Amino acid sequence: MGRVSYFFAGGGTGGHIYPLLAVAEQVQARQPDAEIHFFHSTRAVDERVFEKTGFGRTTLPATGLYAHPIKLLRFVLTFQQSCKIAMREIAKRESAVVVGAGGFVAGPVCRAGRKLGVPVALINVDIVPGRSNWLSARWADEIFLQFEESRSHFPRTRAAMHTVGCPLRSRFLHPDAKKAIADLGLDSNKHVLLVTGASSGSTRINEAICRLLPKLEAFADRWQIVHLTGLDNYKAVLEAYRGTRLSRKVLDYYDGMADLFAATDLVIGRSGAVSVAEYAVAGVPSICLPYPFHKDKHQYLNAGKLTEVGAGVIVDDVADADDRVARLWKELEPLMGDDARRRQMAEACKKAAKPQAASEIAARLIEMAKKN
């Protein structure tokens, strides 16, 4: 077997990118001479993440699947275009493996891999698979799951399925809390409340926290806040903190999340599959506000995995802003004041954590390559 090329496909949100990067790191560590190449979308979040990796990459014109006739036609056309681009790139290599992780970029690349006869793997981190993974399962040889319950959502696949957890980048296995504290200028004598809407930010979480700032000032002597806003809300959130006596660090984005989680005592955030896995592996008690607009409510199911073991609580992101703020404060205030309960929740995270997922998937991909 000559040099193997591993083609990773996913993008549009961090939840489709970070698991692939985690596995790519492990493949590279085990097989240093392997080529790592990514297919990703045109969205800004993809560019922001991939520009720092040093991996080869190709941008695809693929778009999401919608019921609107014009958007549906666009999906079909860009799917075909993306499949052709991927086929040309993959066909240049002597030996290849394709790995998809959902998102509208993954489908055409998995299809390209199947048409070329190379091994195809899927990484599915949500309990309920998205449309891309549901579609791509027909072309997959192996599917790697975060949750055992996901098996029932792939009834027609011929692929072998493995429940391994959600792959996280290697830094999560060896985080450095002191690095994050120094990097962000935090007070090592104060607890850290992390507010995050994942890679793209959350306007509704941002607004809720900003409305709670007067109440949060009661905890200013013992707590500090790291607030990751996303690009769109940064200026407004920064302004909201002005004039408060809260110690805070407001950023639109932060790349060292493993180190930051290690320094965090409580997190408020969404419950995407990657976020839930990060909370668990990092051992951080969480207040989860599942994204309310997914039809399958998969973020509620993800967060449920933390509440089942006592590692997190769920707050409904209801439509009424006043009600949302009141519900959040009802959970947040007692948790900030109860060190013992937070310690119990942090310990409970171990029951949900699967820190070796990336390593296990990488080992299987290398075995798949040997059959090519």
Predicted regions and their residues:
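Glycosyltransferases and closely related glycan-assembly transferases
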Residues: Q28, I85-V98, A106-A121, W134-R138
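An amphipathic, basic-hydrophobic alpha-helix
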Residues: L65-V97
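Donor-nucleotide binding loops and adjacent catalytic segments primarily
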Residues: F39, A44, V49, T53, ...
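Acidic donor-binding loop of glycosyltransferase active sites
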Residues: E94-V97, A262-A277, V284-P285
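Conserved nucleotide-sugar phosphate-binding/catalytic loop shared by glycosyltransferases and other
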Residues: R3-G11, D33-T78, V164-P167, L231-N233, ...
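A short, well-ordered alpha-helix in the C-terminal region of glycosyltransferases
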Residues: R341-P355
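C-terminal alpha-helical cap of glycosyltransferases
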Residues: K354-N372
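Active-site-proximal region of nucleotide-activated glycan assembly enzymes
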Residues: E35, G56, R114-K178
